UniProtKB/Swiss-Prot annotation:
It is an enzyme of class 2 (transferase). Component of the RNA polymerase I (Pol I) complex consisting of at least 13 subunits. DNA-dependent RNA polymerase catalyzes the transcription of DNA into RNA using the four ribonucleoside triphosphates as substrates. Second largest core component of RNA polymerase I which synthesizes ribosomal RNA precursors. Proposed to contribute to the polymerase catalytic activity and forms the polymerase active center together with the largest subunit. Pol I is composed of mobile elements and RPA2 is part of the core element with the central large cleft and probably a clamp element that moves to open and close the cleft. Its EC number is 2.7.7.6. This is DNA-directed RNA polymerase I subunit RPA2. A zinc finger (C4-type) spans 1081-1130. The gene is RPA2. GO terms for molecular function: DNA binding; DNA-directed RNA polymerase activity; ribonucleoside binding; zinc ion binding. InterPro entries: DNA-dir_RNA_pol_su2, DNA-dir_RNAP_su2_dom, DNA-dir_RNAP_su2_hyb_sf, RNA_pol_bsu_CS, RNA_pol_bsu_protrusion, RNA_pol_Rpb2_2, RNA_pol_Rpb2_2_sf, RNA_pol_Rpb2_3.
Length: 1166
């Protein structure tokens, strides 16, 4: 394995070291190449002036996009008073990091000459660090000069000052026929079955359209597609006849492929042809006309001048097998799907697993961004502009001459400026507002905030991949299972426990989703290369067919030809040789070409549909392995991996082995591989560590003075771990430490260490162990105050930051923490109610103070004054960061790197701590019972290794699955300890800190890297006596900031019931919650119909108690005697009884009464 490790580091570490490479490549490729491809596929906008409208000098207007152009981020107009915009400025000013988008638009009036003009469509958000970012190509020093982290890798958008990441989603494999069963198909009609074959067809501009062939009980096939969120079912014969002029016999022979003896297939094909006979279609034009007549109502780009045949052509080219432009290729693809459907129905092949990675692709952020942008650009012309033109024609002051200057008139141009805002809204909310839904199964949850709690959490956002929000709502667990096909592509360890388990995964360390095309393949040249290797090209002559003993060759969803069964392996091996060696002089085959060979099983039933499947498109999972035949690195995909023999180690190599893993650790994600000696731990503990590593206080960044994150945790005195993994070095994780090396003794001491609690040495605590801070940033914009001005005053200089409080107010308010300019003083302390900002109102000539509302003490860390885009010096915004001290207190959580989580139970004086013969007292004590049930042997090994490293004065760089002499890792580090005069097993004689006598047992003591988690008592402590209550239920409101109550849930209730604490239960859930008194009618049992009638007799003299206290008892008694409780239903007052009841019960009775449901109560005396 040593040779493999060197081979790995030398050859490919640079390739996948960039954590967010797939995000950046996808965006750059989408914007630089595919945006103009989308432009070519967009239909022109044809506008025919209605006859009843006023004459405007023309009858028909045609507009279309010719090309798009993107600029660089800047402020101000191009070539006029502009300056370069950098991400750091956008963060501090809470702006969006955008680039200008320009379009060249052609227009034509009737038969006049074509004219063109260039227009700015708006500013769209851009991704940081690469092609469309001003940080591209900057060195570490230049990055630091621009206010960025020296190790900044980009891959995110900046929207309103926040870093947003478009998360990766799993989608069905593109341009590949997938056979499956779905019970929902049965609901479409009486003849429908649950068998289907679907293909997610994706065009070169990433536009997707899924078509599904469904098997009917009579043997025929129906094609299903969704267009603008509507489902359409079309007989397959109608599509086949429209794509190609052919006879029924030719279609019959192409599907049957010489198997005339199989009566079952023949009957099914005859059923397909019978549907065509019923529809009276015999040639291509008839089929197109029928399709066009049915779909012209819903198709975009159809005018009254468009014929049914042209509408049918438009439907076929834009919605059927859109990954290819040729009708011939579309026809062959549908025939191929019918073949697989019939084979699945006949049980000749197994159904495909939609949850397998082999049947999946990844939807990258840049590709999704392009799909949304393309749709918005299309809607701008075809929907927004059409509505605007219709509105202009109906204006009473319509001017025909101005109307010709279409798209140059700002009134007509208004729809275009919304493109940037819509893209910004998508990134800010993660919600997809789409006319077509982009062939996706969800409309929300696409974007997440790239929060920098620590560096590990931040980088994991770029490696996470989600199964889809649709599956999170399902009760089935099959989508969550870890399948063998995921080996090397999806990390088996790094997934959260709880609701998202198995749905939110992380790609492995070596997995690289392809974000861009390595090279665009010339299909004709590639067909010739395959022909030289032995492929027979598919013929346009439908009479020439190949029987089922041939392998079909499919390239990116296009059926190219067939290969004989006997030469299938040699054909694939020859193609793999050209891929690995790049020895083709005329035409180089992409290194990431997928060569998936599924051979015949040799039995009557195949596990998979046999064929040779080639793919070169982006958005595929790939990873590098070592090809043993050619001694080079080969990039493979999940479908390709299933039929390869890949050895993990040197000992696994057999004569049949073709490939070998570069490093066994490559199956783990970056976060999972950071854990040291993880292979010696119980598996769930490694899962817990992946989550806790992302909840640790540490060093989130190095450009602290330029960051304005809403909330940031920071450890004041972090250490580099003495024992670290090679992954931490390769990915620069060690530059952002998130823990402390602590001397840990495993001993039961004082009794405060039960149930995972831990004892911290008080002197270590005083030296700064675990000390941290929390930063919160706030922004105050004068524009917001200006917009709230009364009486329509819009003066931009009404409000100023100025400490101009009157002498009368100064005597009442302490302003020592506010500077003369009205801004907070850096370093000043803030307490609740203390002024933190002073704004002067120039209109009312008075000062307005903004007061600190938090109950916890804090200090001003930084203050930033930012200008506005209107270049008005008085139109400012102020940003300031507040620092909260977070020293460890009892109840705060700590954890090791092995999933051992515990809370601080007590700070124990150093004089009472146990000590070794060398006089070393531990920083931390944990109970020995933490290990047997958790089986985290890796933590014990780490303790020995770090102890050895500290004695030898060196860092220990280890790696998961690393081999040691005689496979004895304890012996390896034990000998190092023995050489330094310490015990072989890491035990030492310790003395009692209280009595000074030796302890009877040797104590295991060493050095462990401990992490402080963000779950702190200071953030969660909550208590109240009385406080705000809910208006409807009269129960205490929830929320710590609102002064709400503590949640008393079902488990708490059950515990009191089990203890029989009835009075305590009554006090907590009734008297201290929503206690109320009311009346219940004993006759009808209603608590809603009773009311109190206080009738004062005419002979009674009412004396207020406040005027005559001596008559208070008499007066109260008189009023009480005159109260009458009457039931409105029964009209009686003798049967109403006063009871104590929860107010929420009264609320429930009212709600049920509104639905016609009556609650009846019975009153008994106990």
């Amino acid at each position: 394995m040593k040779t493999n490790a060197k081979f790995d580091r030398k050859e490919i570490s640079k390739i996948y070291k960039n954590i967010a490479r797939h995000h950046i490549d996808s965006f750059d490729f989408a914007m630089s190449t595919c945006l103009n491809r989308a432009c070519e596929h967009m239909l022109p906008f044809d506008y025919i002036v209605p006859e009843e409208s006023a004459s405007c000098g023309f009858k028909k207007l045609t507009l279309w996009y010719d090309s798009f152009e993107l600029g660089q981020p800047s402020l101000g107009e191009i070539d006029y008073d502009s300056h370069i915009l950098y991400p750091s400025e956008c963060r501090q000013r809470k702006m969006t990091y955008t680039i200008p988008l320009f379009a060249t638009i052609f227009k034509k009036f009737d038969d006049e000459m074509v004219d063109n003009f260039k227009v700015k469509l708006g500013d769209i958000p851009t991704m940081g660090r690469k092609k469309f970012c001003n940080l591209k190509g900057l060195t570490k020093k230049e990055l630091a000069k621009r206010g960025e982290d020296m190790l900044e890798f980009g891959g995110y958008f900046i929207v309103n000052g926040n870093e947003k990441v478009i998360r990766m989603l799993i989608v069905p494999k593109r341009n590949f026929p997938i056979a499956f069963k779905r019970s929902k198909f049965l609901e479409r009609g009486k003849d429908f079955t649950d068998y289907g074959v679907q293909m997610r067809c994706v065009r070169d501009d990433f536009t997707a359209q899924t078509i599904t062939l469904t098997y009917l009980s009579d043997g025929s096939v129906s094609l299903r597609l969704i267009y603008q969120k509507q489902e359409f079912l079309i007989p397959i014969i109608l599509i086949l006849k429209a794509l190609k002029n052919c006879t029924d016999r030719q279609i019959y022979e192409r599907i049957v492929k010489g198997n005339f003896n199989q009566r079952q297939i023949s009957d099914r094909v005859e059923a397909i042809l019978a549907v065509g006979k019923d529809l009276n279609i015999y040639d291509s034009d008839q089929s197109k006309a029928l399709i066009g007549s049915r779909f012209r109502i819903v198709l975009a780009g159809i005018t009254s001048e468009t014929s049914d045949i042209d509408a049918g052509d438009l439907f076929l080219s834009k919605h059927i097998c859109i990954h290819t432009d040729s009708y011939e290729a579309k026809f062959d693809t549908l025939i191929l799907m019918i073949d697989k459907l019939y084979a699945s129905v006949a049980n000749e092949v197994e159904l495909d697993n939609l949850d397998s990675v082999a049947m999946q692709d990844v939807l990258l952020g840049g590709h999704l961004y392009l799909q949304i942008l393309s749709e918005k650009l299309f809607d701008c012309l075809h929907i927004n502009l059409r509505a605007r033109l219709n509105k202009e024609l109906k204006r009473h002051n319509f001017d025909p001459m101005k109307f010709r200057d279409v798209l140059t008139n700002q009134k007509i141009n208004c729809g275009i400026g919304l493109i940037g805002k819509r893209m910004e809204n998508f990134l800010a909310t993660g919600n997809l507002i789409s006319r077509t839904n982009l062939d996706l199964m969800q409309t929300s949850g696409f974007c997440i905030i790239g929060d920098k709690l620590n560096n590990i959490r931040f980088l994991s956002h770029f490696r996470s991949i989600h199964r889809g929000q649709y599956f999170a709502e399902q009760k089935t667990t099959s989508v969550r299972k870890l399948l063998p096909e995921s080996w090397g592509f999806i990390c088996p360890v790094h997934t959260p426990d709880g609701a998202p388990c198995g749905l939110l995964n992380h790609i492995s360390m070596s997995c690289v989703p392809i974000g861009s095309e390595e090279k665009q393949i010339d299909i004709d040249k590639f067909r010739n290369i395959l022909g030289e290797l032995g492929m027979n090209s598919i013929s346009s002559d439908l009479c020439l067919n190949y029987h089922t003993g041939y392998y079909p060759v499919i390239f990116d969803g296009i059926h190219l030809g067939y290969v004989e069964k006997d030469i299938g392996e040699s054909f694939v091996e020859g193609l793999r040789y050209l891929k690995c060696t790049q020895s083709q002089p005329d035409y180089a085959i992409p290194r990431t070409l997928e060569i998936a060979f599924i051979p015949f099983s040799g039995y009557s039933r195949n596990l998979q549909w046999p064929g040779i499947f080639l793919a070169s498109t982006p958005a595929r999972f790939t990873r590098p392995v070592k090809n043993l035949h050619y001694n080079c690195i080969e990039w493979i995909s999940p479908l390709e991996q299933m039929n390869l023999s890949i050895a993990c180690t040197d000992e696994d190599i057999t004569p049949e082995t073709t490939h070998q893993e570069l490093d066994p650790i490559n199956i783990l994600s970056i976060v999972a591989s950071v854990g040291v000696f993880a292979e010696y731990n119980q598996s769930p503990r490694n899962m817990y560590q992946c989550q806790m590593a992302k909840q640790t206080m540490g060093t989130p960044y190095h450009n602290h003075q330029f960051r304005t994150d809403n909330k940031i945790y920071r450890l004041l005195f972090p250490h580099r771990p003495i024992v670290k993994t090679r992954t931490q070095v390769d990915f620069d994780i060690e530059e952002y430490p998130s823990g402390t090396n602590a001397v840990v003794a495993v001993i039961s001491y004082t009794g405060y260490d039960l149930e995972d609690a831990m004892i911290i040495n008080k002197s270590s605590y005083e030296r700064g162990f675990g000390h941290g801070v929390v930063y919160k940033s706030y922004t105050h914009d004068l524009n917001e105050s200006n917009s709230q001005s009364t009486r329509g005053i819009k003066s931009s200089v009404r409000y100023k930051f100025l400490n101009n409080v009157s002498q009368k107010d100064k005597s009442k308010i302490k302003l020592e923490n506010i500077d003369p300019d009205g801004l907070p003083k850096i370093g000043s302390q803030l307490t609740k109610g203390k002024p933190e900002l002073c704004i002067f109102d120039t209109l009312k000539r008075g000062a307005k103070l903004s007061k600190f509302k938090d109950s916890e003490k804090a200090r001003i860390e930084t203050v930033r004054v930012c200008g506005n885009d209107d270049k008005n010096p008085d139109n400012l915004s102020i940003g300031y960061t507040i620092r909260y001290s977070r020293i460890p207190v009892i109840g705060d959580k700590f954890s090791s790197r092995h999933g051992q989580k515990g809370v601080l139970s007590v700070l124990w004086p150093q004089v009472d701590m146990p000590f070794t013969e060398n006089g070393i007292t531990p920083d931390l004590i944990i109970n020995p019972h933490a290990f047997p049930s958790r089986m985290t042997m890796g933590m014990l090994i780490q303790s020995m290794a770090a102890k050895s490293g500290s004695l030898r004065g060196e860092f220990k760089t280890v790696e998961t699955f690393q081999r040691y002499d005689d496979n004895d890792i304890v012996g390896h580090f034990g000998k190092e300890l023995l050489d330094k005069g310490f015990n072989y097993h890491g035990n030492e004689l310790m003395y009692s800190g209280i009595f000074g006598t030796p302890l009877k047992a040797d104590i295991f003591i060493g050095v462990v890297y401990y992490q402080r988690l963000r779950h702190m008592v200071s953030d969660k402590s909550q208590a109240r006596g009385t406080g705000p209550i809910d208006i409807l239920t009269h129960q205490p409101v929830k929320g710590r900031k609102k002064g709400g109550g503590i949640r008393f849930g079902e488990m708490e209730r059950d515990s009191l019931l089990a203890h029989g604490a009835a009075y305590c239960l009554n006090d907590r859930l009734f008297r201290s919650s929503d206690y109320s008194e009311g009346f219940v009618c004993q006759n009808c049992g209603s608590i809603l119909s009773c009311y109190v009638n206080r009738a004062i007799m005419k002979t009674q003299t009412f004396i207020p108690p406040s005027l005559d206290e001596s008559n208070k008892d008499t007066e109260d008694k008189e009023i009480h005697m005159n109260e009458k409780v009457i039931c409105k239903v029964c009209k009686k007052n003798s049967n109403c009884k006063k009871v104590a009841l929860p107010f929420v019960l009264r609320f429930l009775a009212n709600e049920l009464a509104s639905m016609g449901i009556k609650l009846k109560f019975t009153v008994n005396d106990f």
